Amino acid sequence: MSIKQLSETLINQIAAGEVIERPASAAKELIENAIDAGASRIEIATAGGGKALLRITDNGCGMDGQDLALAVRRHCTSKLNESLMDIKSLGFRGEALPSIGSVARLTIASRRADSASAFQIAVEGGKVGEVRPAPGNPGTVVEVRDLFFATPARLKFLKTERAEAAAITEMVKRMAIAFPKIRFVLSGSDRSTLELPATGDDHLARIAQVLGPDFRDNAIALDAEREDVHLGGFAGVPTFNRGNSAHQYAFVNGRPVQDKLILSAIRGAYAETVPHGRYPVAVLALTVDPALVDVNVHPAKSDVRFRDPGLVRGLIVGAIRQSLTREGDRSSTAGAGAMLRAFRPGANGGFSEGAQAAANNSYAPAYGARPPQPSAWSVDTSPHRPLDDGQNRFDGLALPAARADAHVSPSQISEPVAMAMESGRFRLGAARAQVHANYIVAQTQDGLVIVDQHAAHERLVFEDMRKALSGRRLPSQGLLIPEIIGLPEEDCDRLMDHAENLDRLGLAIERFGPGAIAVRETPAMLGEVDVPGLVRQLADEIAEWETAGSLFARLEHVAATMACHGSVRSGRLLRVEEMNALLRKMEETPGSGQCNHGRPTYIELKLSDIERLFGRS
């Protein structure tokens, strides 16, 4: 069979198969054209999930009749000259319009601002019509009907109208975040409308429009630079997380991308701070010299290739971690919001259904719950006791031992602590009570804080262990009688393969015959610990990450497990000075707003919110 030149229509249909995968792909290409044209207002109308109709209206620079005729021809563009190494526009290939026109019914009407008349051209299944005069305002209107009518096999691979419409909405949100100075309006056939007014230079306001106002309250600003790469944007606190990665947005020179390198860097930055199966919320904006990034590696331009990927990844991981550390013990406000919603009075004047259920069960012990136990954790023996030179800060706090139903009257708080609370020096306030032998209630300058004592202390122990990891071996305590633990042979082998790493953490183990491990030393900072439970859990977790991760990451993972076993447990009564020592240590420790599993360690309620619940504001 002889080789022959393909027809222009077939060439465009092949290109459409790469560039236009679904209605959202077509909408993205057309919106990029509108942005490149300098539009400040873009309206998107859809019907049938974008399959029946896509109409993009903008107030950009527009085109005259000559440009319009060239725009529907393949590889005709005003955005590229001779080099692919200096691309500053979103589009540059000149493929979108001819590709769409080859598989749909395409109509374009456009008018330049300095022209008295508009022009129109139609393309149907690759057949290009003539340019004709037409009425119209300055700007461009692109209308796509019956997408893929010329390639009906493609229609079988599209999802439902609802799913395709959702994909268009998500794409518009990504574009809107990247360009806050542009007003976006999206309307569907079901009369639903997404309207995003322009926010100018206030990127966080635009992000809040898309992700909701909660993100504004839980966002940390990013501003870091390394060599020729700048990172801006916002990262959510670890406890503000979601069930999937759909709320992770990345932009390179204003271009929305879903790049694996960037998404991997986000995961690495939040390692050990977000629960398994949960995903942090982040909006990252990278500004790179165009010569240092290749945007022409994917047909849909959703991936990029950096000249120095290691530099970019290191910048992202380092900037996010430093920002999280700088925020210290900050935790998500979502927990407080959920609590307020639960206790908001219902229509009948009582509590809402969730609050009523909680009230009905407030004095009923949970199934299988242990009764309160005397504390085996003491401020005097804990590695997290106050420093000697700071002990005076807690003078006067030797109140009666807190019980599960204990409370502290205002007169019982010492004058130094009261003054510190008024000045705001103690951000987490002073302990008022311990309820259900699990939660510490503290009064702050402008509200109250509820602390999960186990989760908080677990984080403190972990941070101390992680800090010690960067230096010498962690201090250990020898066991008077070695603990012999029976394990499956494969678990014994795994533990012994990592015996050196465990020894750095203060856990000294050795073989004790077939199917057994002898533990001779445990980390000193853990105090009394369930050694068999700790070793068995370590064996299980080592089996999961045995072939992945760096040494330090593995050691951190082990440290997190050890911290959980060595922390003050739920159900233990604490003295008031112990509670306050825990609060002070939390204030000093970066990342103490969430435990090692990513759950919040405390919830803060502002006085204004509490007063609203009682109708006092």
UniProtKB/Swiss-Prot annotation:
One of its GO terms (cellular component) is mismatch repair complex. Residues 382-392 have a biased composition (Basic and acidic residues). The keyword Cytoplasm does not apply. Residues 363-394 are annotated as: Disordered. Transmembrane segments: none annotated. It comes from the Bacteria. GO terms for biological process: mismatch repair. This protein is involved in the repair of mismatches in DNA. It is required for dam-dependent methyl-directed DNA mismatch repair. May act as a 'molecular matchmaker', a protein that promotes the formation of a stable complex between two or more DNA-binding proteins in an ATP-dependent manner without itself being part of a final effector complex. This is DNA mismatch repair protein MutL. It comes from Allorhizobium ampelinum (strain ATCC BAA-846 / DSM 112012 / S4) (Agrobacterium vitis (strain S4)).
